[in-house]
Amino acid sequence: ADTWIFITPCYVNAIPGDAVEVLAKLHQAELSRNKYVYAIAQGGMPYTHTHHCCIGNIELFAKAMQLRWMGGLVIGGGAIIDGVTLKRLPNAVPVEHCLQKLIACTQHKTKVDSLLSKQAEMKIPGFVARLMCLKMNHTIHKQQKKIKADRHICFYAKEEKHARKG
């Protein structure tokens, strides 16, 4: 195939280790340099800018292998890779349109518009985002109280302190 499309889940600042391993094996195989490379990264955060590092990692890989980097699409706001249909995503309509545009780019071997991910992004009003953050913080603090954790002291710092004593 003369076109590679990498589809990977994305954590806040990295692609999974298994995906990195696949990229490393492809790099070692030194396959043909005349490949077109596209990427789709999916993460749970609704804002796509939190997942651009994944597309960036694949772009760096493509450039290191002297492949033709053609761009990618970041999909945020829900699971797609776990087999849930697109229609169940909260931002299903814009994501579907953006995927169609990406497919057209792969068929015509053209670059993906860098603003495509922004078009797929969920539009969350500021006050709703604030409410979501307050709810998330409340839930975290409630869980910390349940396990009697001091939220003002870093849990890992406490572990390190005990490790030095023992």
Model-derived features with residue positions:
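Contiguous hydrophobic segments
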Residues: 33-36, 40-43, 66-86, 130-144
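Residue-identity detector for threonine
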Residues: 3, 8, 48-50, 85, ...
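C-terminal and late-domain segments of enzyme folds
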Residues: 90-166
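Active-site/pore-lining binding-face segments in mid-to-C-terminal subdomains
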Residues: 54-115
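Helix-loop-strand module that forms the ligand-binding subsite of alpha/beta enzymes
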Residues: 1-66
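Weak global preference for isoleucine
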Residues: 5-7, 15, 40, 55-58, ...
